[in-house]
Amino acid sequence: MRPSQTALWLGLVLSLALLAVGWASARPPIYVSSWAVRVTKGYQEAERLARKFGFVNLGQIFPDDQYFHLRHRGVAQQSLTPHWGHRLRLKKEPKVRWFEQQTLRRRVKRSLVVPTDPWFSKQWYMNKEIEQDLNILKVWNQGLTGRGVVVSILDDGIEKDHPDLWANYDPLASYDFNDYDPDPQPRYTPNDENRHGTRCAGEVSATANNGFCGAGVAFNARIGGVRMLDGAITDIVEAQSLSLQPQHIHIYSASWGPEDDGRTVDGPGLLTQEAFRRGVTKGRQGLGTLFIWASGNGGLHYDNCNCDGYTNSIHTLSVGSTTRQGRVPWYSEACASTFTTTFSSGVVTDPQIVTTDLHHQCTDKHTGTSASAPLAAGMIALALEANPLLTWRDLQHLVVRASRPAQLQAEDWRINGVGRQVSHHYGYGLLDAGLLVDLARVWLPTKPQKKCTIRVVHTPTPILPRMLVPKNVTVCCDGSRRRLIRSLEHVQVQLSLSYSRRGDLEIFLTSPMGTRSTLVAIRPLDISGQGYNNWIFMSTHYWDEDPQGLWTLGLENKGYYYNTGTLYYCTLLLYGTAEDMTARPQTPQESHCPLSIVAELCLISSKQWWWLYSHTQQPVTKGQDSCHPPTTPARQLDQRLHCLFPAPHAGSASEPLQGLSPLAAILAISLGPWCCPC
């Protein structure tokens, strides 16, 4: 064959290969026989629709009367096309506010399969075998073991009768959303593919001092399991799993997500986003549910966890991995949304994580970021035992402060605008359980979350090989010009753009205080030409920085090809609080409060009533000048106390406790004449 013909054939083969990769990265949706429907008249209307159109009403998706799960036995269980007939019928119904035929969602467990190595009998990551471990023994020595905290593992089930799990097993924190029954027992297969959830559960709450296997980080916490990954995964299944018993479960731990293949951009559907929102606003009696998420195992494919809409949600706490030697594991994904890091393993000769396994066994072969997230969930359970009144945002602030660079090795460690070291590989560093609990005991409640939305680009703009888009932020104020945000928390960039080869485009953001955060780095396997459609990137690297000043969005072609594209719109979303969080002590301070449970509460005495101040009603600030003028004898209280607000209508003996939660009212009556500085 002549050289010209050879080159032609090679080019054709290469083109076909690239097309195959492109098709694989843009799979068509697979529609199933389930619909999510939102109706205005609740259960009766859902029943009427089901009878009229031949659906089976499988009940509410959330614990209210709006969203329902309908299934049609006459529709194919899997199809490449939606059912247009039912779409048109539901669209004509005036009481149907929204509906969506469900599609299968590809979700992979974030564990790693490695060759069998000799058994490691010691849990090196928490028994002081290494100098800088997770510092869990310090917390155990204080008598904290997770008692009173409930954790649920969202995965492929949990072996509830395991000798190291049955004593802590909580059926109220468990369910099977694959078969819709209360039993989360995993399905057994010849290769034990459904061992993942049982392994994660043992890391959190394996029973201690029973002569079997090892001990969980929070070995007296109650543990549940949700079976949801061993079957058809839809938006309904994910939302129901994340909404299970939100007033009973404190922490959900998830070690799964979209495919870590270096070319997928995917995230939660509408129902799952709603489940996250409801969890943090209504869960735990309004304190907010904790969603702990594994950051991902796509490092081998140069994946980036900011292309995963679960790990980069402001409602989840994303956890990365490091090895015993403090190195970046080969599977680890670097991204700006990671908060913190715990241990796992790297190469096959590295020691791994000891935990429970199927068939009433133990294993020392648990690894990947799947192993890291449950360790963090257990440590947060210890912090919640120390201070049950922490909100979901309080815990995120505490994790930032309780993570330390320690011995973690990476070339991208940087100091942000408030002096903290941060890395795309590790977030703020290795989570220290002892420091986390010490801070939790004396933590004062964070002021309410504020949000600023700033439009950066609103007209289509061609993307240059290297483009910088500046935006001066001066409007994070309310109508009275009071600053809404003084200290940042999460920062998001929401944008839509087209690009001829998406994986070649690097996007970064620089804050007014000079912190540069890479929102997405080059992904060589992502050859998609679809760009990003209304995608949200998130960074934790600006935590506690001042948002006022010049922000700069950068876009740069990092590939070997000439690429073209258009930035259609871009919005900067700033979340934070009106308090200057840098003024708070960065290390635990001695508490003068006699009961740690009221570390977040101010109690004052007036006319024989104990008034209780809760952070959900008024902000806590220092100094009398910052307070609303008190109208009762609270004026005469010692000025060394922070702001103390009397209950309204103090003249009535029946009214002072109105508006308080049941827990707050009980505390107000029973704690006696203690007054704590807030």
Curated annotation (Swiss-Prot):
Residues 446-580 form the P/Homo B domain. Residues 27-110 form a propeptide. Expressed abundantly in the testis. High levels seen in germ cells but not in Leydig, Sertoli or peritubular cells. Expressed in the pachytene spermatocytes and the round spermatids but not in the elongating spermatids. May be expressed within hormonally stimulated ovaries. Glycans are attached at residue 472. N-glycosylated. Synthesized in the endoplasmic reticulum as a zymogen, is matured by autocatalytic cleavage between the prodomain and the catalytic domain. It is found in: Cytoplasmic vesicle, Secretory vesicle, Acrosome membrane. Residues 123-437 form the Peptidase S8 domain. One of its GO terms (biological process) is peptide hormone processing. One of its GO terms (molecular function) is serine-type endopeptidase activity. InterPro entries: Galactose-bd-like_sf (IPR008979), Kexin/furin (IPR034182), P_dom (IPR002884), Peptidase_S8/S53_dom (IPR000209), Peptidase_S8/S53_dom_sf (IPR036852), Peptidase_S8_Asp-AS (IPR023827), Peptidase_S8_His-AS (IPR022398), Peptidase_S8_Ser-AS (IPR023828). Its main location: membrane. One of its GO terms (cellular component) is acrosomal vesicle. Pfam families: P_proprotein (PF01483), Peptidase_S8 (PF00082), S8_pro-domain (PF16470). Keywords: Cleavage on pair of basic residues, Cytoplasmic vesicle, Glycoprotein, Hydrolase, Membrane, Protease, Serine protease, Signal, Zymogen. Its EC number is 3.4.21.-. Gene3D superfamilies: Galactose-binding domain-like (2.60.120.260), Peptidase S8, pro-domain (3.30.70.850), Peptidase S8/S53 domain (3.40.50.200). Residues 1-26 form the signal peptide. The proPCSK4 form interacts with HSPA5; the interaction takes place at the endoplasmic reticulum. Belongs to the peptidase S8 family. Furin subfamily. Proprotein convertase involved in the processing of hormone and other protein precursors at sites comprised of pairs of basic amino acid residues. In males, important for ADAM2 processing as well as other acrosomal proteins with roles in fertilization and critical for normal fertilization events such as sperm capacitation, acrosome reaction and binding of sperm to zona pellucida. Plays also a role in female fertility, involved in the regulation of trophoblast migration and placental development, may be through the proteolytical processing and activation of proteins such as IGF2. This is Proprotein convertase subtilisin/kexin type 4. It comes from Rattus norvegicus.
